[in-house]
């Protein structure tokens, strides 16, 4: 499986980047995770031609080609960072690559809550009509006290959190497999229905 990991902040020292980098290395035998930065993208400005900047278009294509997306978000004032919200607005207004795309939400914070309120808000945003992401239900990974969570090699020090992350990622991989198959089947049936004509129905009736 191939996943795109989005660092949901422009902070150069964010532990959310460390979390995704740990996941990339820790799960390398199970899946390929490409960690993507969003800090250099321009702020969303609702262009009249609905054409995304080049960097947004490149990321959008990567999302299209991936089996799923992992977003790691910090929490600023009970919500997600402005740079992450801006990216989502670009995607929803232009290329819409998150439609039917399986998404796993994780997060790290310096405090004890592990970006829980930001994650809840992000899930709500991703369910918007022009996004329609397939968000993994029932599982959330919250890494609190994240400044102390990693060693100098980027390894996650909390063994109970490693176990929890293993379980969440295993569930996500299963969720991705099931979701993508269901979406594929649904799109096939929709296409077949679109091609259906009343003439075909009449011909079928005559043959009967």
Cite the ranges covered by each PLM segment.
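Helix-loop-strand module that forms the ligand-binding subsite of alpha/beta enzymes
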Residues: 51-130
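N-terminal beta1-alpha1 ligand-phosphate binding loop
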Residues: 1-30
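Secondary-structure boundary/capping motif
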Residues: 12-15, 44, 79-80, 114-115
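Glycine-rich phosphate/pyrophosphate-binding loop and the adjoining helix
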Residues: 134-208
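Short hydrophobic segments within beta-strands
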Residues: 6-8, 36, 106
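N-terminal beta-loop-helix "entrance" segment that forms/cooperates
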Residues: 37-55, 149
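A generic structural motif
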Residues: 28-34, 132-133
């Amino acid at each position: 499986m191939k996943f795109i990991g989005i660092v949901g902040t422009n902070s150069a020292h964010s532990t959310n980047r460390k979390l995704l980098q740990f996941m990339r290395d820790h799960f390398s035998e199970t899946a390929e995770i490409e960690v993507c930065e969003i800090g250099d993208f321009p702020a969303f400005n609702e262009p009249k031609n609905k054409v995304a900047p080049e960097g947004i278009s490149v990321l959008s294509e990567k999302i299209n080609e991936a089996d799923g997306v992992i977003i790691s978000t910090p929490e600023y004032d009970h919500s997600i960072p402005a740079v992450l919200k801006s990216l989502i607005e670009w995607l929803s207004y232009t290329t819409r690559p998150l439609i039917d795309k399986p998404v796993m939400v994780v997060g790290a914070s310096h405090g004890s809550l592990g970006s829980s309120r930001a994650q809840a808000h992000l899930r709500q945003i991703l369910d918007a009509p022009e996004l329609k992401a397939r968000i993994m239900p029932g599982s959330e990974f919250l890494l609190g006290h994240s400044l102390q969570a990693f060693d100098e090699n980027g390894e996650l020090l909390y063994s109970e959190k490693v176990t929890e992350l293993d379980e969440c990622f295993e569930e996500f991989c299963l969720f991705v497999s099931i979701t993508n198959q269901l979406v594929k089947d649904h799109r096939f049936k929709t296409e077949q229905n679109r091609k259906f004509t009343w003439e075909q129905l009449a011909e079928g009736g005559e043959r009967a």
